[in-house]
Amino acid sequence: MPARRRWFENRPMLKRIVLAVLALVILPYVLIFFYLLPFIHPVSTLMLRDLVLLRGYDRRWVSLDQISPALVQSVMMSEDGQYCFHGGVDWAEMRMLVEDTLKGQATRGGSTIPMQTAKNLFLWNSRSFVRKAMELPLAVSTDFVLSKRRLMEIYLNIAEWGPGIYGVEAAAQHHFKVPASKLTRRQASLLAVSLPNPIDRNAGKPGRGLRRLAGVIERRAQGSGEYIKCIYE
């Protein structure tokens, strides 16, 4: 037995730690295949955190067919206009993000819906290069394994829309007292633009800036036909 391997074998605690870390790294890629099954309703790491802290949360799973198309269109135009055309990562956007960072300029988020879904399902919420490095391969894998419809369905059912409010059905009921299937274009656009910061941006009580931004997204959503074909064709 080589000396290096013998050194490792003689340290059972270190061996267990390494194996545990490897299992945690591999587990998300295994779970992605389980999420192919439509009757499995994934939860996010934020939901698990709320359970551990005994806060509880409101999430009511609905299928994509039970969600207003206006909401899907608004979220795509607000969060990821190239959703139907990339493979999980918008590399052109990522390149500009890296260039801005190297220049010391303020950066945009650069996260696609698959990247946000991977983060919500498997990673933590704070921004860091370590998290982003883990997020990229998970996003590509998620986009490759899941259909665009299934991926969108999962995203809209785990996204945070306020303290303890997860998923579009709970958000629609909480902010507008209607089911997700009955959201108007204005309500849908308000929910969409609140996604980047749902704690500070209240879709049910929007300020002037949020209403103005929602108006922009509402107009984009109305002309989004070519951009949403992977969802509704």
Swiss-Prot record:
Mind listing the UniProt keywords for this protein, alphabetically? Cell inner membrane, Cell membrane, Cell shape, Cell wall biogenesis/degradation, Glycosyltransferase, Membrane, Peptidoglycan synthesis, Transferase, Transmembrane, Transmembrane helix
Q: In which pathway does it act?
A: Cell wall biogenesis; peptidoglycan biosynthesis
InterPro entries xref list: Glyco_trans_51, Lysozyme-like_dom_sf, PBP_transglycosylase, Pep_trsgly
List the GO cellular component terms. peptidoglycan-based cell wall; plasma membrane
Q: What is its EC number?
A: 2.4.99.28
Q: Which GO terms describe its molecular function?
A: pentosyltransferase activity; peptidoglycan glycosyltransferase activity
| Predominant place of localization | membrane
Q: Where do the TM regions start and end?
A: 17-37
Q: Which reaction does it catalyse?
A: [GlcNAc-(1->4)-Mur2Ac(oyl-L-Ala-gamma-D-Glu-L-Lys-D-Ala-D-Ala)](n)-di-trans,octa-cis-undecaprenyl diphosphate + beta-D-GlcNAc-(1->4)-Mur2Ac(oyl-L-Ala-gamma-D-Glu-L-Lys-D-Ala-D-Ala)-di-trans,octa-cis-undecaprenyl diphosphate = [GlcNAc-(1->4)-Mur2Ac(oyl-L-Ala-gamma-D-Glu-L-Lys-D-Ala-D-Ala)](n+1)-di-trans,octa-cis-undecaprenyl diphosphate + di-trans,octa-cis-undecaprenyl diphosphate + H(+)
Question: Which terms does the UniProt entry file under GO BP?
Answer: cell wall organization; peptidoglycan biosynthetic process; regulation of cell shape
Q: What does the UniProt entry say about where the protein is found?
A: Cell inner membrane
Q: How does it sit in the membrane?
A: Single-pass membrane protein
Family listed: Belongs to the glycosyltransferase 51 family.
Q: What does the UniProt record say this protein does?
A: Peptidoglycan polymerase that catalyzes glycan chain elongation from lipid-linked precursors.
**What is the name of the protein in this document?**
Biosynthetic peptidoglycan transglycosylase
Originating organism? Rhizobium etli (strain CIAT 652)
